[in-house]
UniProtKB/Swiss-Prot annotation:
This is Threonine--tRNA ligase. Homodimer. Its cofactor is Zn(2+). It catalyses: tRNA(Thr) + L-threonine + ATP = L-threonyl-tRNA(Thr) + AMP + diphosphate + H(+). GO terms for molecular function: ATP binding; threonine-tRNA ligase activity; tRNA binding; zinc ion binding. Keywords: Aminoacyl-tRNA synthetase, ATP-binding, Cytoplasm, Ligase, Metal-binding, Nucleotide-binding, Protein biosynthesis, RNA-binding, tRNA-binding, Zinc. The N-terminal domain is an archaea-specific tRNA-editing domain that hydrolyzes incorrectly charged L-seryl-tRNA(Thr). Catalysis of tRNA editing is performed by the charged tRNA itself. Residues 1-143 are annotated as: Editing domain. HAMAP family: Thr_tRNA_synth. It comes from Methanothrix thermoacetophila (strain DSM 6194 / JCM 14653 / NBRC 101360 / PT) (Methanosaeta thermophila). Catalyzes the attachment of threonine to tRNA(Thr) in a two-step reaction: L-threonine is first activated by ATP to form Thr-AMP and then transferred to the acceptor end of tRNA(Thr). Also edits incorrectly charged L-seryl-tRNA(Thr). Binds 1 zinc ion per subunit. GO terms for biological process: threonyl-tRNA aminoacylation.
């Protein structure tokens, strides 16, 4: 089912002419008007025929939640086939609409426009941030769905914007001028619509740059990585791993699949909001991991450690983790079914220690994203917590907002539905106004008990630790998506897109003017000892320079007769120049710039042949 929910000053309709699918309705039901109403435009879909009752229950819950949030006491149900291209049978649609009307009438004044009629309608939308929302109702796809995911769908959220200093206001009362990206993020979060309606710009870029592509021979959401893409991904993996180890984590490795009937794991599955891949093997029901929690917690159960080891951190870069995301939500690198997740868990002695570690990991995540190429202005912050936690720790929450020095989205629950009491995410909002979570940390108050994890305190007594879940960058693939989308927006505004020099597959391209300059070009490549290639193709210099620009090469150096005689290179620096502005520099000066821009970052060799004439084309 697809829902478009509009909070209106009024909505009125008149049924003009029946189609061959029109339901029979009395004359007085062929027109109607509601003032101060929430209008639900509805398309009942083919998928809904599998379980109409479940669809009605979930749709009623969504409509009721929005109606309460906007304080609407009247609801208009309006059949609107244009919301979907996969409509149900007319019989199912009428049944669902009637049952939905009956369900909502217990709490609201409800009117319903008849199904299958040509109708005219007039509506005046109120125009506040919550006045236009959409919902997609999906009841299963054959995957294993956790109890927590079902709870998440029912959880009632209290949304606020927290300003620096701690003031909280409802989104509809916040002045978003100067915070337009935050406004888009707020709408995306409240609407909860993850379906893909347009292809984001990074999909064209990841293919044109020969980084990543779809793999038609696999399940949707599983990608192939070309040499350049594998290089970028590998560098990010190494960097995030290095940062986790610098934080004091011990690197471990755990299995990718687990027994679904394991008593402890079964309980945890029902507390984690995710859809799992389920497989059968040797009469066992197995599932593929969606994080490193399972293996690290089982390892923690078997460990012996004391308060002297706290905070104790374990880290794994899971290649891969798996989530059976809904097919309509999969696109490019934004949302995948197989992904690489840096996953660190920290055992803390008490809540005070956990909160201090949370703050440190919050700040470390800001640093990780900054070094990868995303500044605070490039993403929005969401902080989510239970009401009890907030009441007891207001100053701490306000301090998190002060660190980022900008308004953040707050989601508060009256009760705890999940295993955590506090979490944050840094969310990237792309050119299509879709948001994706990157870095995150959660304070877990359940799983030490569930997995029987304990440490020995100073008095020799066994205690349960508080556990932090931390991904300093979020999934590596999603970080690549955010970097590409950021550059797409820069290009759309007239800028020159490029990856940071340390992530660029080719850091320097040498362009010989003629064949007699090839030897010097190769010599320069060897002297620089970075990721340097040589465009030895039989093309004009102008064409070679344009191609280097299309590949986002940070430094392009031309070698001709003048360069042979002076020993200097004519270099275009992409970050500060145009093709009409050249800089003369020596090999040593160029190498010094490269060293400065890549200091403290991982390094990999050029992933392709040095000579462009020897390279295969992947796309």
């Amino acid at each position: 089912m697809q829902l478009l929910l509009i909070h209106s000053d009024f909505i009125e309709f008149e049924a003009k002419k029946p189609t061959k699918f029109a339901e029979e309705v009395p004359e007085e039901a062929r027109s109607g008007r509601l003032d101060e109403a929430l209008c639900a435009f509805i398309a009942v879909e083919k998928f809904d025929e599998d379980d109409p009752d479940a669809v009605v229950a979930q749709a009623a819950g969504e409509i009721e939640e929005v109606a309460k949030r906007v304080k609407a006491e009247r609801i208009m149900l309006y059949p609107y086939a244009h919301l979907s291209s996969a409509l149900s049978s007319p019989e199912t649609a009428v049944r669902v609409l009637r049952d939905l009307e009956s369900t909502l009438k217990s709490s609201f004044e409800v009117a319903r426009a008849p199904f299958g009629w040509y109708k005219s309608f007039t509506i005046r939308c109120k125009g506040h941030p919550l006045s236009e929302l959409s919902r997609s109702i999906r009841i299963g796809e054959g995957e294993v769905v956790s109890q927590a995911l079902k709870s998440e769908a029912k959880a009632v959220s209290h949304w606020r914007i927290m300003k620096k200093g701690g003031e909280m206001v409802p989104p509809e009362e916040f002045d978003f001028r100067g915070h337009e990206r935050l406004e888009k993020f707020v709408r995306y979060e409240i609407e909860k619509s993850r379906a893909v309606d347009r292809i984001p710009p990074h999909v064209e870029l990841m293919r044109r740059l020969e980084l990543v592509d779809y793999e038609p021979g696999s399940d949707p959401g599983n990608m192939r990585y070309y040499p350049k893409g594998r290089l970028v991904k590998s560098l990010l993996e190494s960097y995030v791993t290095d940062r986790a180890l610098e934080m004091g984590a011990m690197e471990v490795e755990t299995p990718v699949m687990y027994d679904m009937d394991h008593p402890t794991l079964k309980k945890y599955l029902d507390r984690f909001p995710a859809r799992q891949y389920a497989i059968e093997a040797d009469k066992k029901h197995l599932f593929l991991r969606f994080a490193a929690c399972f293996g690290q917690f089982l390892m923690g159960h078997d460990m012996t450690f004391s308060y002297r080891s706290l905070p104790l951190r374990m880290f794994e870069l899971t290649r891969y983790s798996f989530r059976r995301e809904q097919r309509g939500e999969l696109v490019g690198l934004r949302r995948l079914r197989a992904f690489t997740m840096p996953d660190m868990h920290t055992f803390c002695g008490d809540m005070s220690s956990a909160m201090e570690e949370f703050r440190k990991q919050y700040e470390a995540s800001i640093s990780v994203l900054r070094d990868a190429g995303l500044d605070l202005k490039d993403y929005e912050v969401a902080i989510r917590f239970t009401k009890d936690f907030y009441e007891n720790n207001k100053t701490f929450i306000e301090g998190l907002v002060d660190i980022v020095d900008k308004p953040v989205l707050i989601e508060m629950w009256d009760e705890r539905f999940f295993y955590f009491v506090l979490k944050f995410e840094f969310n990237f909002v792309d050119a299509l106004d879709k948001a994706s979570a990157l870095s995150t940390v959660q304070i877990d108050v359940e799983n030490a008990e569930r997995y029987d994890i304990g440490y020995v305190d100073a008095e020799g007594n066994r205690q349960r630790p508080i556990i932090l879940h931390c991904s300093p960058s979020g999934a590596i693939e999603r970080l690549m998506y955010a970097l590409l989308e950021k550059q797409a927006m820069i290009a759309a505004n007239g800028g020159l897109p490029m990856l940071p020099t340390w992530l660029s597959p080719t850091q320097v391209r040498i362009i010989p003017v003629a064949e007699r300059h090839h030897a010097r070009a190769m010599e320069v490549a060897e002297q620089l000892n970075f990721r340097v290639d040589v465009d030895d193709r039989d093309e004009t210099v102008g064409k070679k320079i344009r191609d280097a620009g299309r590949e986002w090469v940070p430094y392009v150096a031309v070698v001709g007769d003048e360069e042979l005689s002076t020993g200097l290179l004519t270099v275009t620096v992409r970050s500060e120049s145009t093709s009409n502005q050249k800089i003369k520099m020596s090999v040593e000066e160029l190498r010094a710039r490269l060293q400065s821009e890549t200091a403290g970052r991982p390094w990999r060799r050029l992933p392709l042949p040095v000579r462009l004439s020897e390279r295969p084309k992947f796309v």
